C-alpha cells in the first residue's frame, strides 16, 4: 500500500512539473519593405535554391553536383548534423530512468572435508530524477536548437560551395576567352608584321616600323603563358572544391551563347531573407539555444529530487531458491545547494547575458545580410551599365585598327598609329571578357546573398 502511494505521488509530481525560464517566441527583426536598389524583373521563373540552373550550362550544374557529393566540407557538415542528432538523443534520455542489472555466482569449500557450497546473487536497480523544474526539457530544447543550427550551417556550407564552384568556373571561362583573344591578336599582328616587312623590302617603310611590329608580337606572346597559368590555377581550385585531383577535372569550353548568357534572378522581398539565409536561421537557432540555457540555469536554483529502486536476491547451491528469496527497496531523496547560491545566481546572470548577446548577434546578422544584398545589387547594376560601353569601345577600336592598317598600307599613316590601334583593340576585347566575368560572379554573389543555393 505504501509503495503504491509513493509511486502515485511521484507520477502526479512529474505530470504537474513546471518549465522554468523564458519561452522562446521567435526572433524578431525589422527590415524595409522593398530593396533600395532594384533589379530588372526576371524573364522566367527561377528557383533560388538552384540558381546556377538559370545559366543553362550543364557543365556548371554537373560541377556543382559533384562538389555537393564529394567536398570534404559538405561531408563534415553532414557529420556535424549526425553529432547534433546524437546529442539530442542523449538529452532526451534524461527523461527516463536509468536501469542496471547485476549478477554473480561463486563456489566455496573446505579443503579438509572436500565439500563445497555454491552461491548465486543478482539484482536489478533503477534510478530516476523527475524533471520537476523543466531542466531536462530545457536541455532537450537547447539540443534541438543546436541541431537546427547544425543543419543551417550545413546549408550555409552548401550555398557557399555552389558560389565558389561557379566563381572558379567563370574565372576559367574568362581565362580561356582571354587566351583565345590573345592568340587571335597574335595572328593579326603576325600578318601585320609580314606586310610591314614587304613594305620595308620594297623601300616604302623603315626598319623602325619592322622593329615596332616585332615588339608588338613579342608583347602579345608574353601574355599567353600568363593566361595559360590562370587556366591551370582555376582547374586546381576547382579540383579542391570538387574533392578530387586536378587530373580528374575535365572541362570543355561552352558555346558562346551559353557563356555570354546573363540571366535575371528574382530578388523577392527583404523580409524573405529571414527564412532563406542560412546564417540568419543559424543565428536564430543560437538565440533559441541561449534562451533555453536560461531555463536550465534557473532550474538549478531549486531542489532536485531523485528516486531509486532495487530488487535483489541471493541463494545457495539450489538455484531454485533464488527467486523465492528476492527482496526490494524503494527510496527517494531531495537535494538543495545551500552554500554555493551565489555561483548559481551568477550562472543565471551569465545565461541571461549570453541570451542578450545572441539576440544582438542575430540582429547584426540580419542587418549585414540586408546590406550585402544591397551591395550586390549596386555592383550588378554598375557592371551591367558598363558592359554596353565596353562592347561599343571594342567595336570602334577594331574598326580603328583596320582603318589604320589600310592607311599604313597606302602610306598615309605610320606604323605607330597601327600599333597603338592594335593595343587599344586588344585592351577593349579583354575589357569585355572581364566585364562579363564580373557580371556572372556578381550574379553568383547576389543569389547567395539572397539565400540561394539550398532547398528549404
Which role does the model predict for each range below?
Residues 77-91, 157, 161-184, 188-198, ...:
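Amphipathic alpha-helical coiled-coil segments
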Residues 201-230:
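Repeat-solenoid scaffold signature
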Residues 1-6:
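Bacterial N-terminal signal peptides that target proteins for export
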Residues 20-23, 50, 56-58, 63-66, ...:
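Small/polar-residue-enriched beta-strand and adjacent coil segments characteristic
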Residues 16-17:
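C-terminal motif of bacterial Sec signal peptides marking the signal peptidase cleavage site
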Residues 206, 225-274, 443-456:
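Short, solvent-exposed, mixed-charge loop/turn linkers that connect secondary-structure elements
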Residues 27-45:
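Post-signal peptide N-terminal segment of mature Sec-exported envelope proteins
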Residues 57, 70-73, 129, 163-164, ...:
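Short loop-to-helix capping motifs
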Amino acid at each position: 500500500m505504501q509503495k503504491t502511494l509513493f509511486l502515485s505521488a511521484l507520477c502526479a509530481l512529474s505530470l504537474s512539473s513546471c518549465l522554468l525560464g523564458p519561452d522562446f517566441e521567435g526572433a524578431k527583426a525589422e527590415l524595409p519593405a522593398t530593396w533600395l536598389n532594384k533589379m530588372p524583373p526576371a524573364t522566367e521563373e527561377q528557383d533560388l535554391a538552384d540558381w546556377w540552373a538559370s545559366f543553362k550550362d550543364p557543365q556548371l550544374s554537373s560541377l556543382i553536383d559533384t562538389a555537393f557529393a564529394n567536398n570534404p566540407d559538405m561531408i563534415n557538415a553532414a557529420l556535424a548534423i549526425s553529432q547534433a542528432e546524437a546529442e539530442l538523443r542523449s538529452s532526451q534520455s534524461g527523461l527516463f530512468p536509468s536501469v542496471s542489472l547485476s549478477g554473480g555466482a561463486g563456489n566455496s569449500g573446505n579443503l579438509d572435508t572436500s565439500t563445497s557450497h555454491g552461491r548465486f546473487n543478482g539484482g536489478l536497480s533503477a534510478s530516476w530524477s523527475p524533471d520537476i523544474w523543466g531542466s531536462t526539457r530545457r536541455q532537450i530544447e537547447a539540443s534541438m536548437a543546436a541541431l537546427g543550427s547544425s543543419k543551417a550551417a550545413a546549408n550555409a556550407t552548401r550555398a557557399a560551395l555552389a558560389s565558389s564552384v561557379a566563381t572558379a568556373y567563370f574565372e576559367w571561362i574568362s581565362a580561356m576567352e582571354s587566351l583565345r583573344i590573345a592568340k587571335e591578336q597574335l595572328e593579326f599582328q603576325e600578318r601585320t608584321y609580314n606586310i610591314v616587312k614587304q613594305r620595308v623590302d620594297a623601300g616604302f617603310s623603315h626598319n623602325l616600323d619592322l622593329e615596332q611590329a616585332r615588339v608588338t608580337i613579342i608583347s602579345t606572346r608574353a601574355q599567353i603563358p600568363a593566361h595559360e597559368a590562370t587556366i591551370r590555377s582555376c582547374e586546381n581550385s576547382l579540383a579542391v572544391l570538387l574533392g578530387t585531383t586536378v587530373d580528374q577535372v575535365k572541362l570543355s569550353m561552352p558555346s558562346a551563347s551559353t557563356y555570354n548568357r546573363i540571366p535575371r534572378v528574382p530578388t523577392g522581398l527583404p523580409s524573405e531573407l529571414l527564412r532563406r539565409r542560412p546564417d540568419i536561421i543559424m543565428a536564430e537557432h543560437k538565440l533559441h539555444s541561449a534562451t533555453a540555457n536560461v531555463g536550465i540555469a534557473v532550474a538549478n536554483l531549486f531542489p532536485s529530487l531523485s528516486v531509486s529502486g532495487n530488487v535483489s536476491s541471493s541463494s545457495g547451491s539450489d538455484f531454485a531458491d533464488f527467486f523465492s528469496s528476492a527482496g526490494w527497496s524503494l527510496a527517494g531523496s531531495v537535494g538543495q545547494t545551500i552554500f554555493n547560491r551565489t555561483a548559481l545566481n551568477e550562472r543565471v546572470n551569465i545565461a541571461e547575458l549570453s541570451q542578450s548577446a545572441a539576440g544582438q548577434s542575430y540582429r547584426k546578422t540580419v542587418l549585414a545580410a540586408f546590406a550585402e544584398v544591397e551591395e550586390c545589387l549596386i555592383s550588378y547594376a554598375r557592371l551591367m551599365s558598363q558592359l554596353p560601353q565596353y562592347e561599343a569601345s571594342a567595336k570602334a577600336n577594331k574598326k580603328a585598327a583596320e582603318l589604320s592598317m589600310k592607311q599604313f598600307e597606302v602610306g598615309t599613316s605610320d606604323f605607330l598609329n597601327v600599333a597603338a590601334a592594335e593595343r587599344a583593340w586588344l585592351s577593349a576585347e579583354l575589357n569585355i571578357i572581364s566585364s562579363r566575368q564580373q557580371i556572372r560572379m556578381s550574379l553568383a554573389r547576389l543569389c547567395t546573398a539572397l539565400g540561394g543555393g539550398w532547398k528549404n
